[in-house]
Structure formats: C-alpha cells, structure tokens
Amino acid sequence: MLNIVIFGAPGSGKGTQSERIVEKFGINHISTGDVLRAEIKKGTELGKTAKGYIDQGQLLPDELIIDILASTLDSFKESKGVIFDGFPRTIAQAEALKKMLAERGQEVSVMLDLDVPEEELMTRLIKRGQESGRADDNEETIKKRLVVYHSQTAPLIDWYKNEGKYQHIHGLGTMDAIFADIVAAVEKL
C-alpha cells in the first residue's frame, strides 16, 4: 500500500504533481481542497462552514477535515494507496492521519515536500487566481495563507523527519524535472 503525503506551500504544485503521481502509480487522490470546493458549490452545511474559513485564509478545524477524510478514504474499496493533497496541515492532523491509517493496517509511506521560494509562490498564485477566478488566490488572501502555512503547517517537516518519512523535493524547474525527482524518491521506498 503506497500512501503519500504531498506537502508544500500554496502554489507549490501539489495538485499538478498529485495528478501525475496518481497516473504513474495507480493510487487514489484525496485533495481536501477539491472536496471542500465541491461541498461549497453544492451549498451543503459543511460547504457553508468551510467557505467562511477559506474566505478568511484560515485553516478548517481538525475534526471537520478528519471526518471528511475518513469518509473519503473508506469510499476507496480496491486501492493500491492514496495521495493526500492538502492534508495534514498541522501536527495534530498528522497524528490523526497516522492513527486513522493504523486502524486500517496502513501507514504513510513518504511525505514529499515541494519546496518553492516565496516570491515564486506569489507569482504562481496571482497568475492562477487571474486564470481560474479562485477567490482565495488574491494577493491579500495569498499573504495570509503563506503566514498560516509558515506558522502552523511548516512544523510538520520536523514531525515527518522524526517519523523517518520526510523527502525534500526541489520545487523549481520544469514540471517534468520535478516529477522525475518525485518518481525517484517514491521508487526508492
């Protein structure tokens, strides 16, 4: 079972590389962002609650995310593994993921950290916002998201290093070059 956590700041290429990993290794993809955006679009209670946090550039409460994740994970019957995109974002979530997988006789295989300089992240996100119309890709919200990332999410790097699961991926360069580094890291497992 190949369970990958793909990690990096907003705009680091997690979604793009996740799609390629899914195709290459035949695993399922759980993007908490995509799941939440679908709930928002449907106008569900969960979606309305999530929208309030997202519009403010805030992280959602752990219980909310973990419930969504457990339900999505259990919907995959015959699976070679999962790539977790956008989760975990806090140490508490990483511990909850470890417990949730252990209850299913699984574990995280590797945490891939897509490392991209902040100036490049800003450029990518502003461009993405202009092209996609995503409300959370405006300059003010981007800056808030990066502050939240550095204060709440970045400590996960040390947590996964201590777990022996951390793999640094240089996130600048062509999509193909970055993907080649990812494949090399995964195939070493």
UniProtKB/Swiss-Prot annotation:
Residues 127-137 are annotated as: LID. Catalyzes the reversible transfer of the terminal phosphate group between ATP and AMP. Plays an important role in cellular energy homeostasis and in adenine nucleotide metabolism. Pathway: Purine metabolism; AMP biosynthesis via salvage pathway; AMP from ADP: step 1/1. Keywords: ATP-binding, Cytoplasm, Kinase, Nucleotide biosynthesis, Nucleotide-binding, Transferase. Belongs to the adenylate kinase family. It comes from Phocaeicola vulgatus (strain ATCC 8482 / DSM 1447 / JCM 5826 / CCUG 4940 / NBRC 14291 / NCTC 11154) (Bacteroides vulgatus). The keyword Kinase applies. ATP binds at G11, S12, G13, K14, G15, T16, R128, G173. NCBIfam families: adk (TIGR01351), PRK00279.1-3 (NF001381), PRK14527.1 (NF011100), PRK14531.1 (NF011104), PRK14532.1 (NF011105). It catalyses: AMP + ATP = 2 ADP. Consists of three domains, a large central CORE domain and two small peripheral domains, NMPbind and LID, which undergo movements during catalysis. The LID domain closes over the site of phosphoryl transfer upon ATP binding. Assembling and dissambling the active center during each catalytic cycle provides an effective means to prevent ATP hydrolysis. Monomer. AMP binds at T32, R37, Q58, L59, L60, G86, F87, P88, R89, Q93, R134, R145. Residues 31-60 are annotated as: NMP. InterPro entries: Adenyl_kin_sub (IPR006259), Adenylat/UMP-CMP_kin (IPR000850), Adenylat_kinase_CS (IPR033690), P-loop_NTPase (IPR027417). It is found in: Cytoplasm. It holds the Pfam family ADK. CDD domains: ADK. One of its GO terms (biological process) is AMP salvage. One of its GO terms (molecular function) is adenylate kinase activity. This is Adenylate kinase.
